[in-house]
Curated annotation (Swiss-Prot):
One of its GO terms (cellular component) is mitochondrial large ribosomal subunit. It is found in: Plastid. Gene3D superfamilies: Ribosomal protein L10e/L16. It comes from the Eukaryota. Part of the 50S ribosomal subunit. GO terms for biological process: mitochondrial translation. Keywords: Plastid, Ribonucleoprotein, Ribosomal protein. The keyword Plastid applies. It comes from Cuscuta exaltata. This is Large ribosomal subunit protein uL16c. The lineage of its organism: Eukaryota, Viridiplantae, Streptophyta, Embryophyta, Tracheophyta. SUPFAM superfamilies: Ribosomal protein L16p/L10e. Belongs to the universal ribosomal protein uL16 family.
Length: 137
């Protein structure tokens, strides 16, 4: 699972998922990509599940790039704990995804294989996504 090696602070505020993604919304490495259409927190488990599904489906051909990284800690309080006494402990990591963000990229495979691999990866995601193709050869 993906997680930062070290962070400056152990805990973070939740923040707001407003607006669209202005960074990471263009295809940079591959020819095909999976783009988010909704805002969400994607956990490191979900990102890894999508990556595994794509690598299994594409088999040996092609290369896959994961364009998001879970760098936000989510804290969870223990079950049946009274209110107060501070914030919970960091439990898992999430990547903040806004509409327009590229999640995965793929190159070196045919359009048919890429579309099939991305559709399987998209089924692992908690958000609507779209398959896009780079105009630049």
């Amino acid at each position: 699972m993906l997680s930062p090696k070290r962070t400056r602070f152990r805990k973070q505020h939740r923040g707001k998922l407003k607006g669209i993604s202005y960074r990471g919304n263009h295809i940079c490495f591959g020819r095909y990509a999976l783009q988010a259409l909704e805002p969400a927190w994607l956990t490191s488990r979900q990102i890894e599940a999508g990556r595994r599904a794509m690598t299994r489906n594409a088999r040996r051909g092609g290369k896959i790039w994961v364009r998001i990284f879970p760098d936000k800690p989510v804290t969870v309080r223990p079950a049946e704990t009274r209110m107060g006494s501070g914030k919970g402990c960091p439990e898992y990591w999430v990547a903040v995804v806004k509409p327009g963000r590229i999640l995965y990229e793929m190159g070196g495979v045919t359009k048919k294989i890429a579309r099939r691999a991305f559709s399987i990866a998209a089924s692992k995601m908690p958000i609507r996504t779209q398959f896009i193709i780079s105009e630049i050869e």
